[in-house]
Amino acid sequence: MSILYILLSLLLWGLIHSLLASLAFKSFLANLFGKSLMRGYRLFYNIFSLLSFLPILWPVATLPDALLYSVPAPISYAMILGQGAAAVLLILGVLQTDTLSFVGLRQLVEEEKPAALVTRGLYRLVRHPLYTAGLLFLWLSPQVTVNSFTLYVAATIYIFIGAYFEERKLLREFGEVYAEYKSRIPMLIPWLRFQ
């Protein structure tokens, strides 16, 4: 029952998260409330996404569970270091974008400008370094239970689906420039060409 509850929770979160991120929904809101109110949308979206994800973590931690595996030391220490490195990569990936725009603060004080395609730093290695870092952080967990494994699998599937739809959005937004970038740079794993 725990697995089903976690999967349904993440599915519901993913559907809401994806709907709120869609261009069609944002366009609908802009028509309904006007462009000026949309200046705070990115910040609202980020705060809502974070806060609405917390209730998913609660059942993972509190519902009946069983240990799947626990990696012994010293390998577990290396995995924890890997998680730390993944967290650093996540922060670097955000910093290599327009961080204030990414979190939604710049839009509060300035008129939103067309986004620029970031292809430097970590984005020279993979097209989605934030997803790569997130996947590394999840799967380098040295202790995994049935509940956490369920969350990791579902989150991984959601990340791949999200990357697919984000790619389509980026192709619409940047056209040939993104198509050329996509042809040169792997999606998630550096130096792996078939992505």
Spans of model-derived segments:
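Core segments of transmembrane alpha-helices
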Residues: 46-60, 83-87, 124-137
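Membrane-interface helix termini and inter-helical loops of multi-pass transporters
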Residues: 28-32, 61-73
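Interfacial segments of alpha-helical transmembrane regions
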Residues: 70-85
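Hydrophobic transmembrane alpha-helices
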Residues: 2-16, 112-195
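Loop-to-helix transition at the N-terminal end of transmembrane alpha-helices
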Residues: 31-48
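Transmembrane alpha-helical segments that form the membrane-embedded catalytic/substrate-channel core
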Residues: 9-23, 55, 83-105, 152-171
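Juxtamembrane "helix exit" motif at the C-terminal ends of alpha-helical transmembrane segments
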Residues: 56-67, 141-144
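Membrane-interface helix-loop junction between the first two transmembrane segments
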Residues: 18-36
